[in-house]
């Protein structure tokens, strides 16, 4: 579960290493984001020659959470940490590579590009 002020690692090759959630999108009273939800983030740590700079604000989609995601068959998939992929204003991924596994819950029309770039889909 991601909320405002949560820090996430970045699972793409945009050059950002760590981001801070500044807003969970989807309603004025919405508090938590899970896998597949869109959040507004600011870059807290970035590589020197990356595509993004520290302090930049982007949309991002949550791809992994330590809280996990419950499936209809009763199984629970958890990860060691929280991770997100940076998106542009059209909600398309900025990076060209995805690092680490992503969950099958991202297989919607909006995020098929992320699923196809990911090395492993759980």
From Swiss-Prot:
Binds to 23S rRNA. Forms part of two intersubunit bridges in the 70S ribosome. Disulfide bonds: none annotated. Keywords: Ribonucleoprotein, Ribosomal protein, RNA-binding, rRNA-binding. One of its GO terms (molecular function) is large ribosomal subunit rRNA binding. One of its GO terms (biological process) is translation. This is Large ribosomal subunit protein uL14. GO terms for cellular component: cytosolic large ribosomal subunit. The keyword Ribonucleoprotein applies. The gene is rplN. PROSITE patterns: RIBOSOMAL_L14. Belongs to the universal ribosomal protein uL14 family.
């Amino acid at each position: 579960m991601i909320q405002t002020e949560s820090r996430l690692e970045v699972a793409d090759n945009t050059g950002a290493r760590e981001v801070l959630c500044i807003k969970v999108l989807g309603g004025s009273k919405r508090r938590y984001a899970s896998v597949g939800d869109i959040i507004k983030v600011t870059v807290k740590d970035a590589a020197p020659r990356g595509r993004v700079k520290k302090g930049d604000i982007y949309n991002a989609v949550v791809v992994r959470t330590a809280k996990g995601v419950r499936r209809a068959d009763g199984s629970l998939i958890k990860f060691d940490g929280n991770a997100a992929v940076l998106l542009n204003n059209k909600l398309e991924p900025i990076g060209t590579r995805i690092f680490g596994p992503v969950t099958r819950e991202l297989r919607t029309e909006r995020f098929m590009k992320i699923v196809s770039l990911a090395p492993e889909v759980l």
